Amino acid sequence: MFKFDREQMVVEIAGRKIGGQPGEYPTALAGTIFYARHKIVEDERKGIFDKAAAEDLINKQAEMEDITGNPALVQVFGGTPEALVNYIDFVAEVWDGPMLLDSTSGEARMAAAKRATEAGYAKQCIYNSINVSIDEQEYQVLVESDLEASIVLCFDPMDPTVEGKINVLTNGGKTADKGMLELAEKAGIKYPLIDTAVTPLGNGAGAAVRASFAVKALFGYPVGSGIHNIPSAWDWLREFRKQLREAGEREKAKDIHHVCDVGANLVQVMASGDFVLYGPIDNAYMTFPAVAMVDAIIAEAAKELGIEPIDTHPFKKLV
């Protein structure tokens, strides 16, 4: 284990602290709800869903937070403005912790930022995300909102190297005119969470992991990623699981994906990650104990470097 020379920022969003030196604060874990084809969703366009089932999933993740000490975040995904607004209104009613406003649609993200501001729960929200694709209209909505936290994506499609990721943060790299950190600051973002933008194996996955160390060493900001996308996009694993299913080994095929999924998250934790977007919130019961174990190992090793874990750290609660 190691200690960064640069002072490490610790941000507090809706009562959860994220950041610090490795071994100091537990890894924050964000589970996604209302994702594509989520079985609790009845109408993806209108945002109609099983409220009892959704609340149960959020409560189960909160229970794992209480058990392990790892801060829980709810990553709310919606494909349309109507759906995402419906979802975040509901989550704000049943959950007082941080939630991410997430969509592949800029219109939906803008609607969510406006709604969170109007309804008075913007301080609970994390925008996802400030990146090289953000246009002037979406950026202006973010500027005018009350949001103070955002994922800042260090991804340059023209340069997937570690240097490229650092450049896109500082000067826009080969794609944007301004650095993402400058955009975040001018938008009133006080709490930037740097996402190293993990891409598939063979296309920059390793650089994204290495960038985690570089970002913390250079800037001291909290860092993390949605690294579970690696096994999801792994062609070999997809084909291997298909072969198992065809051979009648359906449970084994499912188990192998779960192992790789959770294992990928642990790579981000070991790479000095402060937060992990771990995928479906349904997997909280598997992800939290595994990450808590790795957090405890890191904290124990960091003690020799003079780093003391906080009282709610898994090392203090579970060891």
From Swiss-Prot:
InterPro entries, alphabetized: Dihydropteroate_synth-like_sf, MeTrfase_MtrH/MtxH, MtrH
Origin superkingdom: Archaea
Signal peptide as annotated in the record: none
Pathway: One-carbon metabolism; methanogenesis from CO(2); methyl-coenzyme M from 5,10-methylene-5,6,7,8-tetrahydromethanopterin: step 2/2
EC number: 7.2.1.4
Keywords from the UniProt entry: Methanogenesis, Methyltransferase, One-carbon metabolism, Transferase, Translocase
EC category name: translocase
Catalytic function, reaction form: 5-methyl-5,6,7,8-tetrahydromethanopterin + coenzyme M + 2 Na(+)(in) = 5,6,7,8-tetrahydromethanopterin + methyl-coenzyme M + 2 Na(+)(out)
Gene Ontology annotations of biological process type: methanogenesis, from carbon dioxide; methylation; one-carbon metabolic process
Gene Ontology terms for molecular function: tetrahydromethanopterin S-methyltransferase activity
SUPFAM superfamilies in UniProt: Dihydropteroate synthetase-like (SSF51717)
Pfam families: MtrH
HAMAP family on file: MtrH
Subunit annotation: The complex is composed of 8 subunits; MtrA, MtrB, MtrC, MtrD, MtrE, MtrF, MtrG and MtrH.
Similarity-based family: Belongs to the MtrH family.
NCBIfam families xrefs: mtrH
Main function: Part of a complex that catalyzes the formation of methyl-coenzyme M and tetrahydromethanopterin from coenzyme M and methyl-tetrahydromethanopterin. This is an energy-conserving, sodium-ion translocating step. MtrH catalyzes the transfer of the methyl group from methyl-tetrahydromethanopterin to the corrinoid prosthetic group of MtrA.
Listed name of the protein: Tetrahydromethanopterin S-methyltransferase subunit H
Encoding gene per record: mtrH
